[in-house]
């Protein structure tokens, strides 16, 4: 007979949700280096796929610029973030400028975006599993098996 309560892990260390900040930075940096890569990334991910909130905001402002057929570069992105009141919240001009540093190759953006998407999918699975667990623990009816 199974126990009535699930044992709590003795000293389970907190776990970080799946993410890859290097891939996120590489997506953003690749777009700043080569605007043509934005459509490749946008076909795979949206802003919600980013783990870091600053990266989500930056990508969403890039999307705004793209939708208005404006170039996406350091100047226009900084201006768009400033207009949205988000420039300092994402790390300021220095952080935006640093995104182009260390981008392995802008032509690899599809692979970087796939990594970001995969990590977002894993996070969503964790959120869904936790929601299911919560619902199961709070259920006041018998489960139909």
Please give the residue ranges for each predicted region:
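Noncatalytic partner-interaction/assembly domains of nucleic-acid and motor enzyme complexes
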Residues: 1-120
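Non-catalytic interaction/clamp surfaces of large macromolecular machines
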Residues: 125, 130, 134-145
């Amino acid at each position: 007979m199974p126990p009535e309560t699930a044992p709590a892990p003795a000293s389970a260390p907190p776990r970080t949700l799946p993410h890859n900040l290097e891939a996120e930075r590489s997506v953003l940096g690749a777009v700043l280096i080569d605007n043509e890569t934005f459509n490749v990334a946008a076909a795979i991910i949206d802003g919600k796929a980013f783990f870091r909130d600053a990266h989500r905001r930056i990508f969403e402002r890039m999307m705004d610029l793209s939708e208005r057929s404006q170039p996406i570069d350091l100047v226009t992105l900084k201006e768009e973030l400033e207009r949205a009141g988000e420039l300092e919240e994402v790390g300021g001009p220095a952080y935006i400028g640093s995104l182009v540093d260390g981008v392995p190759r802008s032509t690899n953006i599809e692979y970087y975006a796939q990594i970001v998407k995969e990590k977002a999918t894993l996070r969503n699975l964790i959120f869904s599993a936790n929601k299911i667990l919560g619902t199961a623990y709070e259920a006041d009816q018998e489960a139909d098996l």
